[in-house]
Amino acid sequence: MPKRDDINSVLVIGSGPIVIGQAAEFDYSGTQACRVLREEGVRVILVNSNPATIMTDPGFADATYIEPITSEVLEKIIIKERPDAVLPTLGGQTALNAAIRLDELGILAKHGVELIGAKVEAIQKGEDRQLFKDLVIESGADVARSHVAKTLEQAVEFAEDLGYPLVIRPSFTMGGLGSGFAHTRQELERMVADGLQSSPTTEVLLEESILGWKEYELELMRDTADNTVVVCSIENVDPVGVHTGDSITVAPALTLTDREYQHMRDIGIDIIRRVGVDTGGCNIQFAVDPTNGRLIVIEMNPRVSRSSALASKATGFPIAKIAAKLAIGYRLDEIPNDITKVTPASFEPTLDYVVVKVPRFAFEKFPAADAELTTTMKSVGEAMAIGRNYSTALQKALRSLEKRGSSFHWGAESRSVEELLETSRIPTDGRIVTVQQALRAGATPEQVFDATKIDPWFIDQIVLINEVADAVRDADELDAPTLREAKDHGFSDAQIAEIRGIGEQEVRDARHAAGIRPVFKTVDTCAGEFPALTPYHYSSYDSETEIVPSDRRKVIILGSGPNRIGQGIEFDYSCVHASFALADAGFETIMINCNPETVSTDYDTSDRLYFEPLTLEDVLEIVHVEQQAGELVGVVVQLGGQTALGLAKGLEAAGVPILGTSPSAIDLAEERGLFSGILDAAGLVAPRNGTAVAIDEAVVVAEEIGYPVLVRPSYVLGGRGMEIVFDTATLHDYFLRMADQGIIGEGKPLLIDRFLDDAIEIDIDAIYDGTELYVGGVMEHIEEAGIHSGDSSCTLPPVTLGRGQIQQVVDATRAIAEGVGVRGLLNVQFAIGAGVLYVLEANPRASRTVPFVSKALGIPLAKAASLVMVGTSIAELKASGLLPERDGSDVPMDSPVAVKEAVLPFKRFRTKDGLIVDSVLGPEMRSTGEVMGIDRDFPRAFAKSQEAAFGGLPLSGTVFVSVADRDKRSIVLPVLRLQQLGFEVLATAGTAEILSRNGIQARVVRKYSEEPAAGDSPSIVDLINRDEVDVVINTPSGRTARADGYEIRAAAVAADKPLFTTIAQLTAAVASFDAIRAGFDVTSLQDYAIAREARR
């Protein structure tokens, strides 16, 4: 069946901001879909609110809308663009829920738009817990005993029937949001309340406990002719009870017999048919009781999912690309396999290697959070590795996490076997290492299985790894057989060095002297049956290589590794654009990365892809292979965040050419003493500051500067470890915590700055070629200095800075670029306080705001910077038309305004008492993603950003106000405006008194900690929980008064109420209310570009 000729234009709905449970994998999926649809001659209209994505680049769609993903906005786009169809199955749960809402409101029928990729009935059957349960039972397959509840009362009643513990699973949510295991009625009531709140259909499934069962997934695809393929089987190493996104997973499934696999496959194919997915893919999860083999179906996703991206990267089978073709009418047997070019997509992939995915967590950002892993997903990223056996893939994946202690180690272990086993009973980040240590300390595999319920086969593999480590330790010398045995099981040179008590370079020298180097294999989808035509490689210590280096001029680009808070999709964006630009310039582009979620690890983003850990050893081996032919022009390290920058010195020491800013210049910017010299020479001012490597030094420096001080480690991203410290005792506590984490100490000094209160923070992204500075954009932060730039909302162009101040910022940036010796990208952060411009820090690399600037002003910063790194001048880039003559420092008055807003994951993290962690923002970054609002002025742009990030602001209702003493003067005008808009005002006694003096009538409510008066006197927390408050304004008052504020903020986050913790943020919101009332206009980036050209 050929492509449908009645579909000429398609509206693709993206997934919105990066959040836990829905991350960069949907940018990868959406980018593939947009590409293939355009290749098929379909006009693509895209809507997504996330500016950090590749898919929102104007080149991937004919009309690109960076707008909130709401029914109102989607209808306006449909009216304007008149698409024939809407494709929602590649944008995660966000897109699927949006499409269902369009159907329920009759918008699709009203405008004659078809839903493709999955019918509404199929989505309902797959997502509605009761419908799916009934369907599975009809098929003859087994499910856990369960009931669907729509009220708390129903849930309590059903729990009596099912018994404790039981599982709560909300409908139509992602990443297990609102789910969990309830062991008591108290836990049940809290979890059901959360689940009902999280579910758009206000329903939860209560299910018998299957804790400790083995968990599997199948990725399937089906077309309109009923051709069905199982793309990949995935097995969770962690048993049921840990969300699959938080579990170590392996593909293909390794502990199923062929009979068990075929049975699971048959069930999966029957379910996809019954659900009715006939133009795309789906993911089905199963559980198997290890005691008797009972197999049950857990749930399904009737769309491309997080696991689909992993399955695509694991197999080389592009699920999203094929799903897009199926959606416009093709059959599987009509779609060629990109990798072999001779087999169709109806051939199921075959693997002759093992793939392991390991999650990356960010509990260090939320120290109060309970670190136990449950059915609610908490990981913020993941790394993937490919090996010829499980032990190799596992060890490579663990070292890809780039976290201290994440790999297996063989140093001193002070804990006893009993302590290690007890620790391993609770699933946490790093449990696999605890298991390794327990086995090493003498625990038996049976004891480990009893504690963890991890399948014995996986435990035996760790026993094997420990045995190899013992052989390395006990060998008389580090000879070739010993080294080869270690390498065959994934040991790094650093691990071997630790076991032997020698240096890593000594191991590397011995290995090279013995002629032991990796070869590189190819991912081909067919286990070598057909030749692979796409260069997608992984390392192995087998004897035969499958690659031949080209004789071209080539550039290696180091990716940013697994996503984490502070280093996310924004850096992948820069890497991808560098690859595109350098390829267009005639270079062979070689990407090294280990993140399965990203566009950079798609097999057709670069000329050659190495799916490898970003460690010095692994990168050097790739460099060695590529230098065997052609010319390696250099390695790009300034686009992959701190991961890539951290390798610069080691690569340079090994004689590898570094493109762009040199490692010594990077040190000039990072090392406080050297950077101060540059500022002094340029006549620039920094806040009073100093450095320390010992606690006594730190105390002296802090007392000289004067409290409060801002403290942070060197060489970190995302403000990791950054805090505002008010006294010596807190400084002592801070220093010990950071030293324990190994991020400060000798060679890693602590940076101490005077904290600037009431200052405006400014960001600038620019390119410098050694002669000319080109400004990408100057951004003004909405929140005052003290909140990490990644968590602060910002506006481009600035809305309160004068031309003179902007020019001062540009001049200072030029002086810094020249002094440091930048070649390529530079990000500088400034603050203006009391009329003085302070330099906070300079980063000679890509920043997380590069995509935002590029989308807001239409300037391809990453592409231009990559060409500057290989010697192209800014003048040449202007002459070629890649860079506009007018840079981002000179934005016309009538230009649109763009606002970036951070999206925060507080609802995912709870304390051991079940409370949501405190949502107060500070100098350490906590956001997982971002959105952009763009419109003709700041109020409209800000309103859009709030709608996209938080679901918008209510136009009426009740507002609660409780602010710190320092904010009581500045709170009056915003609250007065809210009252004029019709809001009823509630306040605590102290705040109400101030408001009353200024003519604002506020009803006094008691604090959470105050004793109730006679009669019914609900606290503010009670009112929030009863849904009697619509907006919460609460600014923190310092540590001693935090208890009340914390309870208020936690209740607001749990109830999904708009929460303002800074006056600046509130003031911006109040200014946007008129814009919200007027409704949003929608404009594509392409239309903005046309208007921009007309102004030039």
UniProtKB/Swiss-Prot annotation:
Mn(2+) 2 binds at residues 299, 301. Mg(2+) 3 binds at residues 829, 841. The large subunit is composed of 2 ATP-grasp domains that are involved in binding the 2 ATP molecules needed for carbamoyl phosphate synthesis. The N-terminal ATP-grasp domain (referred to as the carboxyphosphate synthetic component) catalyzes the ATP-dependent phosphorylation of hydrogencarbonate to carboxyphosphate and the subsequent nucleophilic attack by ammonia to form a carbamate intermediate. Composed of two chains; the small (or glutamine) chain promotes the hydrolysis of glutamine to ammonia, which is used by the large (or ammonia) chain to synthesize carbamoyl phosphate. Tetramer of heterodimers (alpha,beta)4. ATP 1 binds at residues 129, 169, 175-176, 208, 210, 215, 241-243, 285, 299. Binds 4 Mg(2+) or Mn(2+) ions per subunit. Residues 951-1095 form the MGS-like domain. This is Carbamoyl phosphate synthase large chain. Large subunit of the glutamine-dependent carbamoyl phosphate synthetase (CPSase). CPSase catalyzes the formation of carbamoyl phosphate from the ammonia moiety of glutamine, carbonate, and phosphate donated by ATP, constituting the first step of 2 biosynthetic pathways, one leading to arginine and/or urea and the other to pyrimidine nucleotides. Residues 1-402 are annotated as: Carboxyphosphate synthetic domain. Residues 951-1096 are annotated as: Allosteric domain. Mg(2+) 4 binds at residues 841, 843. Mn(2+) 3 binds at residues 829, 841. One of its GO terms (biological process) is L-arginine biosynthetic process. Belongs to the CarB family. SMART domains: CPSase_L_D3, MGS. NCBIfam families: CPSaseII_lrg, PRK05294.1, PRK12815.1. Keywords: Amino-acid biosynthesis, Arginine biosynthesis, ATP-binding, Ligase, Magnesium, Manganese, Metal-binding, Nucleotide-binding, Pyrimidine biosynthesis, Repeat. Pathway: Amino-acid biosynthesis; L-arginine biosynthesis; carbamoyl phosphate from bicarbonate: step 1/1; Pyrimidine metabolism; UMP biosynthesis via de novo pathway; (S)-dihydroorotate from bicarbonate: step 1/3.
